[in-house]
Amino acid sequence: MKRPIIIALDFPTAERALAFLDQFPADLHVTVKIGMELFYAAGPSIVTDVQARGHAVFLDLKLHDIPNTVESAMRVIGRLGVTYTTVHAAGGHVMLSAAKRGLVAGAMAAGVTAPKLLAITQLTSTNQAILNQDQQIMGTVRASVVHYAKLARASDCDGVICSAQEVQAIHTAVGADFLGITPGIRPASAQSDDQQRVMTPAAAAKAGSNGLVIGRPITQAAEPVQAYRDIMTEWSN
């Protein structure tokens, strides 16, 4: 899918995650995000189980370590056949470049397409106070995000994870072909939960987002499949 809605499978066990996915018709193939909790609980087999159902996987482990360690880990991830994976832009140019090398090498060894490498800029839970006081980064959140996007582009990443509020600034700075995948998306009727920088699907589409990550408004809906379809309609229109 060119502009996917990525369902965040924020479940503690494989059984619950797969039971959720089994509510979707067999001919409705979606993209799902497997994050730290589910991957650490279930291991790589959860990726295979999701793919066996025809769904694409965004493996969101947010790697951030020394370059050699990240390259080795990404070599393993590259063999899994996932569509997207993540690394922290704060790790710097050498680490980001090592991540890309690892992904490409792993995918080539397995004979699969290399995942898109997405760099985490600032989490959508980061506000101005956290940026300035906790991280000791002076300036605005937007300036920090754009800086990390430029770094990611120069380091052969395929895109970034960012708030929809910053997508236009990123595309202006580094080009519209650089992916801006955006969490912090909530339908107008939903609460923002622990997200600080949120936007509706329709507003994110107008802002130029290349994909949306949505969890609770779908996974905790009374009718998840209908919730997904409703959000897809809003996003597509």
Swiss-Prot record:
Question: What start and end residues bound the annotated signal peptide?
Answer: none
Q: Does the keyword Lyase apply?
A: yes
Pfam families in alphabetical order: OMPdecase
Q: Name one GO biological process term.
A: 'de novo' pyrimidine nucleobase biosynthetic process
Xref: PROSITE patterns: OMPDECASE
Q: Which UniProt keywords apply?
A: Decarboxylase, Lyase, Pyrimidine biosynthesis
EC number assigned by the record: 4.1.1.23
One GO molecular function term of this record is:
orotidine-5'-phosphate decarboxylase activity
Q: Which Gene3D superfamilies does this one have?
A: Aldolase class I (3.20.20.70)
Under which pathway is this protein filed?
Answer: Pyrimidine metabolism; UMP biosynthesis via de novo pathway; UMP from orotate: step 2/2
Q: Identify the residues that bind substrate.
A: 10, 33, 60-69, 124, 186, 195, 215-216
The reply to whether Lyase figures as a keyword in the UniProt entry is: yes
* Gene Ontology terms: cellular component: cytosol
Recorded catalytic reaction(s): these are: orotidine 5'-phosphate + H(+) = UMP + CO2
- The active site annotation covers K62 (proton donor)
| Homology family | Belongs to the OMP decarboxylase family. Type 1 subfamily.
HAMAP family, per this entry?
Answer: OMPdecase_type1_B
What functional role does this protein have? Catalyzes the decarboxylation of orotidine 5'-monophosphate (OMP) to uridine 5'-monophosphate (UMP).
Quaternary structure, per UniProt, is: Homodimer.
Q: What is this protein called?
A: Orotidine 5'-phosphate decarboxylase
From what organism does this protein derive? Lactiplantibacillus plantarum (strain ATCC BAA-793 / NCIMB 8826 / WCFS1)
Report the gene name.
Answer: pyrF
